[in-house]
């Protein structure tokens, strides 16, 4: 089973999302972070489940995480014995 690794950027993204939404509803943002962390765990069991990222090679994939009105997207790259979470964004964010 591949090891799940969070890149420093992905960890910063989760912190940024937390800070951005914490003033609105503390309980909801805690549930969102938990949903993100729980959802990506499946990638260590089935790393090819996400959708391939168009225009990018090297196996980059996006994993859709449903939550609330929109949800999140985790960009990741599966490798031989690891799955690297590269970034996490709101689905509504541009440029991802």
Predicted feature locations:
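Basic/aromatic recognition patch in beta-strand/loop cores that engages polyanionic ligands
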Residues: 47-81
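Basic, Lys/Arg-enriched alpha-helical interface segments
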Residues: 1-61
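Enriched for short, Lys/Arg-rich terminal
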Residues: 21-23, 67-96
């Amino acid at each position: 089973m591949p090891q799940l690794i969070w890149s420093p950027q992905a960890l910063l993204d989760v912190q940024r999302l937390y800070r951005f939404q914490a003033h609105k509803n503390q309980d909801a943002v805690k549930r969102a972070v938990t949903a993100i962390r729980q959802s990506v765990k499946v990638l260590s069991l089935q790393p090819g489940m996400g959708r391939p990222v168009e225009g990018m090679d090297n196996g980059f994939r996006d994993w859709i995480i449903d939550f609330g009105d929109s949800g999140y997207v985790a960009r990741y790259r599966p490798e031989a014995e690891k799955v690297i979470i590269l970034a996490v964004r709101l689905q509504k964010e541009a440029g991802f």
